[in-house]
Amino acid sequence: EAMQTVKPGKALDLGCGQGRNSLFLTQQGFDVTAVDQNELALEILQSIVEQEDLDMPVGLYDINSASIGQAYDFIVSTVVLMFLQADRIPEIIKNMQEKTTVGGYNLIVCAMDTEDYPCSVNFPFTFKEGELAYYYKDWDLVKYNENPGHLHRRDENGNRIQLRFATMLAKKIK
């Protein structure tokens, strides 16, 4: 859906895992850098990159360090922030924002903990209502919602765990 808005450019997949988003973005014409702190996932992605002869840097990176070095047109972090240190989230988001070019975009999807959908999973971090939107108050919120969704994880009865997710595509306007 974001591809209807975001034009190909230099992209960073922050917390890429095995590279589903990275590979998709590469197919869409983006110049992607894929980083994660999971070495096994990176090895799997690197083997795909080599098999497909793709020009995609894959690297080990601790997102908690909030030290993205170069600027990107598009920074993607989907279902990643909830696994990071809660006290580092403000710095991580600030670093993402600072390293996004003017006119560039951030795409974030993250679990929430709300009154109507309390988070039953012991994630290190979850957003509260309106919190992600507040971080991006000086950006153009192209898409923003806090809708219910399901995790792949299941509860003790075998049902997929339901909770709200903050989903945001924001454009840096200054």
List each language-model region with its residue ranges.
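A conserved beta-strand element that flanks and buttresses the S-adenosyl-L-methionine
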Residues: V76
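Class I (Rossmann-like) S-adenosyl-L-methionine-dependent methyltransferase catalytic domain
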Residues: E1-L12, G17-S67, L84, R88-E91, ...
